[in-house]
Amino acid sequence: MKLDFHTHGKLAKRLPFSTVYTDWLFGEAKNAGLDALCLTEHFNTLQFDELYGYLSTRSTREGDALVLENGLRVFPGMETDIAEGGHILSIGPLEAILELNQRLAPHKAPGNFLPFAQLRDLFDQYPVVVGGAHPYREGGHIPQLPREQLARLDFLDLNGKDLATNRQQAEQRT
């Protein structure tokens, strides 16, 4: 299975949700040969619920996946900022992601982000896998987290954007 673990369904988190863009994006993903993707939209994006509501109406449910008309499997997820600096991915059942997003409402603005340990404690209450998003990108501090906290991650995301913009640096850091 060809799977992208870190995909956004919106062009930018401050822009309104666009069904046209999202449909185009998922069509391009399928045309590029992907079988599935994890939709890890920013937790504080505009219209987070609307994006997932739209996908729910345009897909059939198979386990935790939303299967689109073109056959692309979409695994619901979210990208969450942490107080230390950096982003954490969570992927799981749609209901879990939507509930987590609601529970994080008080922590969506800079200055209110949860520290990683508290965020992970929250995620531990749900059937989600949790990973560090693009940990070596400028401004992120995931590699500086204490070793016992790093051990709580299920995976690390090596983002293609990092390879495209500075492959040598990305390879050295990983």
Give the label of every model feature segment.
Residues 47-157, 162:
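Extended substrate/RNA-proximal surfaces in nucleic-acid metabolism proteins
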